Amino acid sequence: MKLLPLLASALLLPSIAHAGDAALDDTLKAFSRCDASFFSSLKAHSDAWKAYAPLKQDKDTAWITVANRASRSGNTVALRNLPPVAGMKLLSYFDESTDLGNVGYYFYWGFMVDGSPDDVAKRLGPLLEKPALLKKIDTAYVRSELRFRDNWVSIEPMPGSAPGKSRVERVLLLEPEGAQTRLSCSVQGAVDAALLVQLRPDIPPAEYPQTRLEKAIG
């Protein structure tokens, strides 16, 4: 009598696993846009992601937590069970912020992935809305955008050129680190609070870049 329920459960397992994999793939696709949709996807698929990463949530978004995004020793968290996403193994998540003065503010978030940038780019390509915009430069892959009148405009990558305080760039970047790839989004340069509200709902207002007046008062 117990055989039928057991068989039914066994038949359900592959479909459940497939649904979980599809949820992870959907979130990585959202991540590749380098905007707030990544955090909305983490919220929508939080049941799948909580098996792999520490999550915090609010009404509309969720995010993977690190101890301190401003600290080298606290801005990375290892992922449990090596989530299989689009045929790749994600090893850890990082969330970094740096104030480089006249060079600009830099916010990075993303994953360390097992494999080379070539391998990761091949797996990531089908998830990208415009894969041709991801350009190979030496051993890395780069997709660059410039903020212009509240819109993002695709530009040719400018390695070695810092945006400073005069412009804002958004970059999807695949870089080699040994046998692994650092898959990151970044927003950099003249980043202000209004932009972070749009792109990074996980960052609290207390960590927004300060204006010159706010720094002077502080």
For each predicted feature, which ranges?
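Bacterial N-terminal signal peptides
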Residues: 5-14
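Short, surface-exposed beta-edge/turn micro-motifs
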Residues: 9-10, 108, 179-182
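Short helix/turn-capping signatures at newly exposed starts of structured segments
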Residues: 19-109
